[in-house]
A protein has these predicted regions:
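Short His-Asn-centered micro-motif
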Residues: 7-8, 98-103, 123-124, 204
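Conserved phosphate-donor/acceptor-positioning beta-strand/loop module used by diverse small-molecule
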Residues: 99-100, 110-135
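Short aromatic-enriched loop/helix-cap "lid" or pocket-rim segments at secondary-structure transitions
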Residues: 110, 131-136, 141-145, 213-215
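Glycine-rich phosphate-binding loop used to anchor ATP phosphates in small-molecule kinases
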Residues: 76-107
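Short catalytic/ligand-binding loop motif for oxyanion handling, primarily in non-cytosolic enzymes
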Residues: 15-18, 104-107, 127-132, 208-212
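PAPS-dependent sulfotransferases, especially Golgi type II membrane carbohydrate sulfotransferases
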Residues: 1-5, 10, 22, 134, ...
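Short, hinge-like loop/turn segments at secondary-structure boundaries
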Residues: 47-49, 136-140, 218-220
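PAPS-dependent sulfotransferase catalytic core
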Residues: 1-80, 234-238
Length: 264
């Protein structure tokens, strides 16, 4: 019996791998929403807020995650995760798993709870990722302390802020900063966590551009045949057709790690 989970920020194309696993007779729990997320999510959300209490914000764009790797995991946290995953963990299916983007926010303790399962780290170019809203855009909703978006804009990108003369443009710019901060934070928490025994990184763009080759990698990793789903090429590189800012320089480290081009 194998257990699989997906790590990746919301609006990162994670529904593609969830739908692929569902099409491949992997039980992903029930009920599911259109994105292939296991519902209801409330216990997972509470688990995110519980873990966030042990993350130390060091100011600016730095967090200390170190105690997450050594402190006792609170019983309340494990109870919440077992509540959320009850249908998956008790299912008799040979291959099963779950997907919800908020798993990324609790990744350090999920790895400690489930060290032997198979993890798929699903990444997407943040320039596309920050164009649309997701529940994790404002990390304060999950107990995470991070810089105020308008203060950050004023100090690091004053020209962008000054150019947003229309209220709607300014509001969208602020949300893109928050989404970029969310992407950056989630990259940081994953990067700071010792990786489990079974770990693979897959770029959404590679899945869209060459599904056959990407699935071959995943089939070798998971040890099961995978079904094909319909993908749309226009989901890659949307930032080229979008108005407004889609890049902030604090994204550079993560983008380089995953091989994304840095705009000049």
């Amino acid at each position: 019996m194998s257990l699989i989970t997906i790590v990746g920020r919301g609006h990162g194309g994670t529904r593609a791998i969830s739908h692929t696993l569902i099409a491949s007779n992997v039980y992903m729990g029930e009920p599911l929403n259109r994105s292939g997320d296991l519902l209801p999510p409330q216990a997972m959300y509470e688990a995110c807020r519980l873990l966030a209490r042990s993350v130390l914000w060091q100011g600016d764009l730095r967090w200390d995650f170190s105690q997450l790797h050594t402190m006792p995991i609170p019983t309340e946290f494990t109870d919440l995760i077992h509540t959320y995953l009850h249908k998956v963990l008790t299912a008799p299916d040979e291959h099963k798993g779950w997907k919800i983007p908020e798993t990324t926010l609790v990744f350090p303790w999920i790895v400690r709870m489930f060290p032997e399962i198979k993890y798929i780290h699903w990444v997407r170019n943040p320039r596309d990722n920050i164009l649309a809203r997701h529940l994790t855009d404002d990390l304060k909703d999950f107990g995470v302390t991070y810089p105020d978006a308008e203060t950050l804009l004023a100090s690091r990108y004053p020209a962008l802020l000054a150019a947003a003369t229309v209220a709607e443009d300014k509001e969208e710019l602020l949300w893109r900063v928050r989404r970029a901060l969310s992407w950056h934070y989630q990259h940081a928490i994953v990067a700071a966590t010792p990786k489990p025994a079974h770990w693979i990184v897959v770029r959404f763009e590679d899945f869209v551009r060459d599904q056959t080759a990407t699935l071959a990698r995943l089939e070798e990793y998971l040890g099961i045949p995978l079904g094909r789903i319909v993908v749309r090429s226009e989901t890659v590189g949307r930032y080229d057709r979008a108005e407004g800012a889609s890049y902030f320089d604090f994204l550079e480290e993560g983008m380089r790690e995953f091989g994304y081009a840095i705009p000049s």
